[in-house]
C-alpha cells in the first residue's frame, strides 16, 4: 500500500510539475523543426490542501527552470533559458485515484524567458499507468506571448518529497524533472 501511495503521490506531483514544465515531450512527425527545444526542465511542486485517501479538490503550484534551450534558426529568441510556473486544479484528487493512473488533468503555465519575454500555456496532462504512473505526458497550446498559437509537448517524471502516507500525513510536495525535451512546435 505504501508503494501505491508513493506512486500516486509521485504521479500527482508529476502532473503538477508537468503543468509547470509546460511541455516536455517528443516532437511530432509534422513538426520537423521545432521553434524551441529545452533539454532540461526541473523544479518543485506544492499541493494544497494536500493529497490523502479522501477525495478532495487540490491546487498544485509548480515552479522550475528550463535550461539548455535552443531555437529554430531565424525564429523567435528566448535567451536560452526560462523560469516557469504552473497552476493545476485537481478536482476530487486522492492518493487512490492517482495511484491508479490514467488521469487527465488540466492547468495553465507561464514561462518568463531569459530575455524577459513570456509564453503562457493551456495544458492537458495525462498520467501513465503501472511503472509509468509517476510520468505525465503534456500537450497544449501557447495562448499568449512569444510563440502564441503554437502547440507544446513534453513529459515529466515526479518524485514525492518527504514521507507522506496519505492517511495521517498528506502529500504536500514533490520534485519533477523532464524525461523528454520541452518542445514548442
Regions inferred by a protein language model and the residue ranges of each:
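Secretory targeting and sorting signals
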Residues: 1-31
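Small disulfide-bonded, cysteine-rich extracellular recognition modules and tandem repeats
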Residues: 4, 20-21, 41, 72, ...
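Classical cleavable N-terminal Sec signal peptides
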Residues: 4-12, 106, 116-119, 123, ...
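Solvent-exposed, flexible loop/coil residues
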Residues: 5, 51, 55, 151
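N-terminal segment immediately downstream of the Sec signal-peptide cleavage site
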Residues: 30-92, 163-185
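Glycine-centered structural positions embedded in regular secondary structure
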Residues: 41-43, 107, 154
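Predominantly extracellular/secreted and cell-surface proteins with exposed
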Residues: 53-143
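A charged, solvent-exposed segment within the mature domains of Sec-exported extracytoplasmic proteins
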Residues: 128-185
Amino acid at each position: 500500500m505504501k508503494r501505491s501511495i508513493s506512486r500516486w503521490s509521485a504521479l500527482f506531483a508529476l502532473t503538477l510539475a508537468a503543468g509547470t514544465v509546460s511541455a516536455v515531450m517528443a516532437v511530432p512527425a509534422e513538426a520537423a523543426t521545432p521553434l524551441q527545444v529545452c533539454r532540461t526542465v526541473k523544479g518543485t511542486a506544492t499541493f494544497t490542501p494536500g493529497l490523502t485517501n479522501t477525495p478532495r479538490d487540490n491546487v498544485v503550484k509548480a515552479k522550475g527552470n528550463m535550461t539548455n534551450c535552443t531555437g529554430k534558426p531565424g525564429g523567435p529568441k528566448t535567451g536560452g533559458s526560462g523560469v516557469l510556473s504552473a497552476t493545476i486544479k485537481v478536482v476530487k484528487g486522492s492518493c487512490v485515484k492517482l495511484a491508479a493512473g490514467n488521469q487527465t488533468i488540466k492547468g495553465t503555465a507561464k514561462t518568463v524567458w531569459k530575455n524577459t519575454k513570456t509564453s503562457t500555456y493551456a495544458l492537458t496532462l495525462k498520467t501513465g499507468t503501472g511503472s509509468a504512473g509517476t510520468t505525465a505526458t503534456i500537450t497544449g497550446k501557447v495562448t499568449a506571448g512569444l510563440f502564441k498559437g503554437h502547440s507544446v509537448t513534453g513529459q515529466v517524471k515526479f518524485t514525492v518529497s518527504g514521507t507522506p502516507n496519505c492517511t495521517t500525513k498528506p502529500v504536500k510536495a514533490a520534485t519533477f524533472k523532464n524525461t523528454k525535451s520541452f518542445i514548442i512546435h
